């Protein structure tokens, strides 16, 4: 088996985790306490043992780890409807939180907890026959997500160097912010994890708020609405690991097809169709329509305009009632559209995946039940605008050295700030260079 261990760090990581495992149990016909129902699609297909391990009593337990430096969020899981799904030992909480401070999560408070966490990771790994890799869910802006998330990735890199490490990161939104020091935490965590993470799927809250408001007509989206939408994306990405399909995509294949250079590993996620229950009956939702709507900025999980950039690689993951003939026709149609530009050194650029299991529907959720859906993961140079926005906010704060004393007081050196900022400047430059046409790049090289 090719197992995957999911690690959910901090409030954002844990709450996205709740939405994901809720959806996985529905997809595989598991009850909230981890037992297979009689009409479950997974009765004859053991593919989902990549994400669940079976106990001797026939119960299925998620291969997951919940970690937070303060107890409140995980206590909700311990007392919630899925409390008997998770193994109690895979929920680790500290006594005091990281207070939105990267340095607390990474150095002071994080140091006390990291060995406990790595011990639990080792137990989960020992329980696997052929571990494929790790999924780490965290936010960039919080203290635990940024600091402790980075620390865990560093340790995973040391202990399990050859295994894939994929991140699912909540990126700071352009105008919404959950804390003043978000830019600091985000720049520091990106700098630390850049060399340790193989592929990082980003979502930002503002983009998802807008999707909930525009496509799903939710006047005031709450975190549950956002997380359930993110869970659909995660589920689409992992579906081919959990179900059989006519064109399966492996964890390593994501990297091979989406990451042209090690540092440029931040694909954009887009989901289609995102339709509310009252609109669903009026839409045909053909493969071509779905594919086309994935290239619309309105369906994207990060605020940036792909029309301003060029695509380097693109993975189209279909689920449900889809045949290869339709997907090939849809891709051929996309290639004729002039608005979608690929870099000239990567002419083909499309990777397809098809999973036969239709998308699941959360009872009482916002999304309508559909026969087919798709998720597009695209590595585009447009995402560099998100980095430059973040860097600008960092510069405004750092020019006055505002709030820096909180970080230095937790044992960080001020030099780390400038080092991290330089690394991100280099990342912006990397994106600029890969987006250049080969001819322009040669001219520029000649000038040096």
UniProtKB/Swiss-Prot annotation:
Pfam families, per the entry: Tubulin (PF00091), Tubulin_C (PF03953)
Signal peptide: none
Catalytically driven reaction(s): GTP + H2O = GDP + phosphate + H(+)
Location, primary (coarse class): cytoplasm
Record localization: Cytoplasm, Cytoskeleton
EC code: 3.6.5.-
GO biological process: microtubule-based process
PROSITE patterns named among the record's database cross-references: TUBULIN
SUPFAM superfamilies: Tubulin C-terminal domain-like, Tubulin nucleotide-binding domain-like
Top-level enzyme category: hydrolase
Site-annotated residues for Involved in polymerization: 448
Its biological purpose: Tubulin is the major constituent of microtubules, a cylinder consisting of laterally associated linear protofilaments composed of alpha- and beta-tubulin heterodimers. Microtubules grow by the addition of GTP-tubulin dimers to the microtubule end, where a stabilizing cap forms. Below the cap, tubulin dimers are in GDP-bound state, owing to GTPase activity of alpha-tubulin.
Entry protein name: Tubulin alpha-1A chain
Upper lineage: Eukaryota, Fungi, Dikarya, Basidiomycota, Agaricomycotina
